[in-house]
Amino acid sequence: MGVFQKGEDQKGESANMKPIPLLSSYDMGKFNLSHRVVLAPLTRSRSYDNLPQSHAMEYYSQRATKGGLLIAEATGVSSDAQGMSVIPHTPGIWTKEQVEAWKPIVDAVHAKGGIFFCQIWHVGRASDMEERPISSTDKPIEKTEENYFLGFSTPRSLTVEEIPDVIKHFTLAAKNALEAGFDGVEVHAANGFLLDQFMKDGVNARADEYGGGVAGRCRFALEVVDAVAAEAGAGRTGVRLSPYSRCLDCADSDPDALAAHMARELGSRGVLYCNVVEPEMVATPAEGGSGGETMRIPHRLRAVREAFAGTLMVGGGYDREEGNWAVAGGYADLVVYGRLFLANPDLPRRFRLGAPLNGYDRATFYTADPVAGYTDYPFLDDDGDDGLAASAASASSNKSGDQDGV
């Protein structure tokens, strides 16, 4: 667990303004964070031909602050690691050209004093390519909670002999991320993608050492984490988990046990942080809903908090008020914001001032336009914006249903 510190006075903030937990400083290993508002890894589909583009320099630097943590969008570890035509143009980091393309983007974040981690992923069976994608299983995705796409290819089950090659791809991606200048690497083991497909028993029915009980199902993900940590250092390695998610037809029958196992294993390895997606459930009328809508299970991650000694990040629908609660109560060290940060490049400043938030434009989440819905969200007007201070309610009212990344 990192060190909680009393927040320093923020620029332009009145000395007698009530302290804001989200804006207190925090030591995450060797990294000194000036606040606890983290940019989620958000797929934006603007890396044409899997190559990061110059417009990403502006996008990320807009959201960078001195001592603020940004996590880059999911970045492929190999040519077959990404394959969703419905979400095209995702970046990679397996070639020299891609590494060179990332360098000026990373430099732009560092020029603002930001801390930048690269999220590395493999989509597994979440692919619609002609060549059969790899997974823990040969069963295709049959339904998605999102209902945005159902044309996934039928996967083939990865053989035990092939697993070391996939691990090598993650290792190379970690090496390349550091060469590009990133401060660290986040292993994407969440949201129904390859590593999650191994971890959850709703998908993984293998009878070998990579299946069966929770320890076997988590073996592959932990071998990837071990390899990445050996390359980058445990103090520069984070992991993203979503044990409670049903995303992409990938669910587990005992998510509490899965969450606790991964928290213990990652803690024993000394990885820098866990970035965990908040649990959700489908409400029934007896639970107070009209039936069928998704509702967050409040604060179910306490078991992860207790089992993992490193930095715990949480995300999935948090607003300003809830984020402050999570930090002040020790429920989490950092709070990850996706759609709120997407639409408000100056989100930490707006939180400080209690300022109104921009709404997001869902239609532009995954379009290829280098400006619209990407770098054109407005900042607060510098003329007189301090007059907006202390209206926390205005910020809290901008509930977004934020799911903090893909």
Swiss-Prot record:
Span of the signal peptide: none
Enzyme class: oxidoreductase
One Pfam family matching this protein: Oxidored_FMN
A Gene Ontology biological process term: fatty acid biosynthetic process
Keyword Cytoplasm: no
Swiss-Prot/TrEMBL cofactor(s): FMN
Key words, A-Z: Fatty acid biosynthesis, Fatty acid metabolism, Flavoprotein, FMN, Lipid biosynthesis, Lipid metabolism, NADP, Oxidoreductase, Oxylipin biosynthesis
InterPro entries attached to this UniProt entry: Aldolase_TIM, OxRdtase_FMN_N, Oye-like
EC number(s) recorded for this UniProt protein: 1.3.1.-
A GO term for molecular function: oxidoreductase activity
Binding site for substrate: 188-191
Presence of the UniProt keyword Lipid metabolism in the record: yes
Source superkingdom: Eukaryota
Binding residue positions for FMN: 41-43, 74, 119, 240, 317, 338-339
Its biological purpose: Putative oxophytodienoate reductase that may be involved in the biosynthesis or metabolism of oxylipin signaling molecules.
Membership in a protein family: Belongs to the NADH:flavin oxidoreductase/NADH oxidase family.
Protein name: Putative 12-oxophytodienoate reductase 12
